[in-house]
């Protein structure tokens, strides 16, 4: 057992059991959790940092402020594309990105499978998360 009183180790069995194939086709998560490379590149997900995915490069902190990147036409265009039927998260991206659980929850909410509810407890669920 790896967990103790200070650290809780949680195996993400759902990621293992689904063999890396997400249940969703549209990629909603990046709007809530962008990724930034060490060079300042802002992309919807780390898997898109490579130059061959330059059409997904939203901006770069070296050249512009986050506020300007966030309010840019590029940001809107890329986020709308990822959430559209033209993008298939099951075939057009890498295996289970950091935004996986956000995308999964939003997909279930939009489809009416499981609505997202406000938290009832004021204590954050992940106050010890690393």
Feature locations, PLM:
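Short, compositionally biased leader-like segments
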Residues: 1-14, 120-121, 125-127
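Aromatic-anchored helix/helix-loop segment that forms the rim or "lid"
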Residues: 11-25
